[in-house]
Amino acid sequence: MGLIAMSERDLQRIEVLSKVIDGRMTMVSAAHVLGLSTRQVRRLLDRISAGGAASIRHKAIGRPSNNRICDGVRDYAMAIVRERYADFGPTLAAEKLAELDGLTVSRETLRQWMADAGLWLSRKQRRTFHQPRLRREAYGELVQIDGSEHRWFEDRGDPCSLLVFIDDATGKLMQLRFVRSESAFTYFEALELYLKAHGAPVAFYSDKHSVFRVAKKDAKGGQGMTQFGRALCELNIEILCANSSQAKGRVERMNRTLQDRLIKDLRLEGICGMDDGNAFLPRFMERYNRQFAITPARSDDLHRPLNLAPDRLRDVLCKREQRYVGAQLTFSFERQRIMLEENEVTRGLVGRYVETHAYADGRLDVRWKGHSLPYRVFDKDQRVTHAAIIENKRLSDVLAYIKERQDERPAPKVRTNSEKNGYTPRGRKPGKRTDFMNDPVVIARRRQALSNLDAAE
């Protein structure tokens, strides 16, 4: 007799029933141990005495399931799938088989059939593998930058974004900065700190965020370059955009590391806001780099000195745009109407373009050939436009701004239909109001009417 496969349950039953047969255990105790009734234990004992221990095994083992779909139905269904639905997913293919072909098969059964036939790959099998990119050889040759929106202060503070600058060759944290959201101004602030601390690298490596890249290929304004890209061009720094998040995997993995390590350090330090967090970040970077930074393949430092005065650097790290001056010496800027003060210089600027310099602290400078022009804000409206297109990375900041503006406005008053039609209540005439219920004339008329009613009856 060959080997017989048994489950753990069957082996336990044989062991307990053997003790009953040998007289070492009662039938009631065996039923309690096996979780069966005494009658079922008696049946199992009869089965052992008739067919041996092998008869304890479940009778359905080795037999096809009673609910098994026959091979003919399977072959017919797969023939239809190969012919018409080869590129369908199992869910959609099962729906179309039932709707168009009158063949009802569960989606999971069809999924297994299609997988066995090679028509469907599981999510794990479809996973694409990205070939790792070797590190750059020199320090300062390539710096990856990214922003990570997260609850960095957990429940102690509001969520914000962390701007991360990491050197590709060494894995060193070059610059960290807590900001409300990713924008050109916040990246200008982080870039200024980076340049003052390390100098100018060869290139930055980023994603396709609108801060770094103009999405429209045929953009007419700005020579197809963002404000951040224009500033880097003036500083002789290249900006490269990754085609996928996997391409800049080092900064993406660094974001996950910081979301673990940095959050716990902030909790231990009791830090609850961005200002205290930014003051703590230099100490965190120093400790992290000392522990995890690696030695590059080449010892060269490719950072270059800026050789720029602080005022000149601030003029580079700002938003610069051209604005057309109208006949009234006015132009539009950020939903504001700017009016130039009339003087000998501004009188000749009608029909010309002036240059606006917008700084991160809210200052606005209007220039003509490098000279500042006096102006005043004629009309100011900073409301977010209705149905404005907002990027996902700026959504939290914009919603906070909208909530602040809504709280400042008075609650809208809902007008009635009469008010919408122009009706105004005239009010009651002055004097004491007549009590018609106790008026003698009214009482006499009521009594006369009742008497007439009685006479008619």
Curated annotation (Swiss-Prot):
Superkingdom of origin = Bacteria
Pfam families named in the record = HTH_29
**PROSITE patterns in alphabetical order:** INTEGRASE
Keyword annotations: DNA recombination, DNA-binding, Plasmid, Transposable element, Transposition
Q: Is the DNA-binding keyword given for this protein?
A: yes
Q: Which GO terms describe its molecular function?
A: DNA binding
Domain named Integrase catalytic is located at 128-313
* A single BP term in Gene Ontology: DNA integration
Q: InterPro entries from the entry?
A: Homeodomain-like_sf (IPR009057), Integrase_cat-core (IPR001584), ISNCY_transpos (IPR047797), RNaseH-like_sf (IPR012337), RNaseH_sf (IPR036397)
Please indicate if the UniProt record lists DNA-binding as a keyword. yes
From the UniProt entry, list the residue stretches annotated as the region Disordered.
Answer: 406-440
Q: Which PANTHER family match?
A: INTEGRASE PROTEIN, TRANSPOSASE RV3428C-RELATED
From the Swiss-Prot or TrEMBL record, give the protein name. Putative transposase y4bF
Q: Which organism is it from?
A: Sinorhizobium fredii (strain NBRC 101917 / NGR234)
The upper taxonomy is: Bacteria, Pseudomonadati, Pseudomonadota, Alphaproteobacteria, Hyphomicrobiales
